[in-house]
Curated annotation (Swiss-Prot):
SMART domains reported in the protein's UniProt record: Resolvase
Keywords, in A-Z order: DNA integration, DNA invertase, DNA recombination, DNA-binding, Plasmid, Transposable element, Transposition
A GO MF label: DNA strand exchange activity
A family per Pfam: HTH_7
Protein name per Swiss-Prot or TrEMBL: Integrase-like protein y4lS
Protein's organism: Sinorhizobium fredii (strain NBRC 101917 / NGR234)
Residues the UniProt record annotates as site (Ancestral active site Ser): F10
Ranges where the Resolvase/invertase-type recombinase catalytic domain occurs: 2-136
InterPro entries reported in the protein's UniProt record: Homeodomain-like_sf (IPR009057), Recombinase_CS (IPR006118), Resolv_N (IPR006119), Resolvase-like_N_sf (IPR036162), Resolvase_HTH_dom (IPR006120), SSR_resolvase (IPR050639)
Gene3D superfamilies assigned to the protein according to its UniProt record, in alphabetical order: Homeodomain-like, Resolvase, N-terminal catalytic domain
Paired cysteines (S-S): none
Length: 183
């Protein structure tokens, strides 16, 4: 049956060539590529296409579990969707093959560690931001809204929808500025 490959990197700066070569060597006839974050299933149209169109007996091939998902929950959602369709998941660089009991167990353990790694990275980032704030060198991102501009437009009689559209913000933000939430 068909083997469908999926290659993913986090940014466009990273190269997919090694993953694509490994997937070709694994016998993948079709390879979908994506350069998106693996932190969520949202915003990954190539992955969703595979999950929507894979058939019973086909194998979804990745190089490593972390190329597919960064949380156990997302990993389980993917595996459940594949299982419901009668398809399997195989990782070329790890002994994860959902068609075997041992492969399923190993796969779940890798998912736990991928989630753990993501949580550690978030903790380190939060610690770094806190330390930078203490030293006065981290200010956060600049505010997206121009409170004065919103108030001026409101005084001129413009409606919240037009203001939001023109300034690229949500209507709710306009209402909050009008109420005085953003002082």
């Amino acid at each position: 049956m068909a083997r469908i490959g999926y290659a993913r990197t986090f940014t466009t700066d990273q190269n997919l060539a090694a993953q694509i070569a490994a997937l070709r060597n694994a016998g993948c006839e079709v390879i979908r590529e994506e350069q998106k974050s693996g932190a969520s299933l949202e915003g990954r149209p190539q992955l969703m296409t595979i999950l929507d169109f894979i058939h019973a007996g086909e194998t979804f091939v990745i190089t490593r579990i972390d190329r597919l998902a960064r949380s156990l929950r997302d990993l389980q959602v993917i595996v459940d969707r594949l299982k419901a369709k009668g398809a399997h998941l195989v990782a070329t660089e790890q002994p994860a093959d959902t068609s075997t009991a041992a492969g399923k167990a190993f796969f779940d353990m890798l998912g736990v560690f991928a989630g753990f790694e993501t949580n550690l990275r978030r903790e380190r980032q939060a610690e770094g931001i806190a330390a930078a704030r203490k030293r006065g060198i981290y200010k956060g991102r600049p505010p997206k809204i121009d409170r004065a501009e919103i108030l001026l437009r409101l005084q001129q009689g413009q409606g919240p929808s037009k203001i939001a559209r023109d300034l690229g913000i949500s209507r709710g933000t306009v209402y909050q500025v009008r109420k005085g939430v953003f002082e």
